[in-house]
Amino acid sequence: MEPSADTHSKPVDIYRDTWVRFLGYANEVGEAFRALVPVGAVWASYGVATTYVTADAIDKGRKAAAAHGERPGKAVCVCVAVVDTFVWQALASVAVPGFTINRVCAASHFLLSRTTRWPLPVRKWTTTAIGLSTIPFIITPIDRSVDLLLDSSLRKLYSEGEKED
């Protein structure tokens, strides 16, 4: 989430370049606290992240519609923008990091229960702290990996469609 060196050529994307981006990580916080809170709280954190993903997709669709104007193919342009954003956000903000934090916490709790004699509450809080501390380290690698995945798969379909127009 560092501001890019070339801030003059690209407008700020509120969903990716500001504090709003952290709403996409709400489910990771929920996963980190899974051992300490009711499962409903974890699911609620996924609701926050999903709302964030949906808002970004709608925003990108509106911007694509405005940029396209009244030229033919507007619906396709908007659809591509919405699908690309939704898939990217669903992977980079919800699915991959949620799974990653869930597994880090599960492995941490398992290892702590096997290697320490700490009381259960201490193990749970330690697991939560490990999960939360992992979040800053996984964000950039996951974002870049999802970009690479989409660039080598789904986005190739979009660019082929643009060449045909």
UniProtKB/Swiss-Prot annotation:
GO biological process, alphabetically ordered: apoptotic process; mitochondrial fission
Membrane topology, as annotated: Multi-pass membrane protein
Cellular component annotations (GO), alphabetically ordered: mitochondrial inner membrane; mitochondrion
Subcellular location: Mitochondrion inner membrane
Major localization listed first in the record, in broad terms: mitochondrion
Family: Belongs to the MTFP1 family.
Protein name in the entry: Mitochondrial fission process protein 1
